[in-house]
Amino acid sequence: SAVEVGLVNVMSRETVLKRYLEGIKGNYDYVLLDCRPSLGMLVINALSASDYVLIPVQADYLAAEDMTELVGTVQSIRQQINPKLKIGGVFLTMANDTNFRRDIVAGVKENFGKYLPVMEAVIPSTVRLAEISTADKSIFRHEPNGRAARAYGTLVKEVEGIGEKQRIRPADIAR
């Protein structure tokens, strides 16, 4: 993308987004950075600027296997650039209601749940989700009572739970 090309010659290019967000993050409860599924410079910037990363995984065998590469990248970012970065959770997307997909979902929870928090939210594959990419509105406005909106609502509550845990300080617990 043009932004990634523009970052090539920038000093400390891995932390451009982090430096920008430092100036505005006090204005927000949460800042969510939604990135394309790649490991380019924009994703590296997002990881260097984040406290937590949520990992969406398509509910198929190969995508679940590829998740280990992203986990390795998160560990590298934590060691080299952002020691605060944690994996907030893994959630499954594009999950059709078939036995095969249910097996994938169960396998991800069983195999990765030992090492990573696997979120309860499972985002279904629906026509409505495909439609919103051209509708210029969220699934909550497009089909507020649909399966996808309910699943994303569950995900939002889980993300809020991560944020609430972060806000609790040891002094608050001791009281």
Tell me what each language-model feature is:
Residues 1-26, 81, 133-135:
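P-loop/Walker-type NTP enzyme "switch/lid" segment
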Residues 2-5, 54-59, 140:
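Short amphipathic alpha-helical segments at helix-loop
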Residues 5, 9, 41, 63-64, ...:
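Generic structural "secondary-structure junction" signal
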Residues 19-23, 45, 154, 158:
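Residue-level signal for well-ordered alpha-helical scaffold segments within enzymatic catalytic domains
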Residues 22-124:
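Conserved catalytic-core segment of NTP-binding enzymes
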Residues 79-175:
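C-terminal lobe/tail of nucleotide-utilizing enzymes
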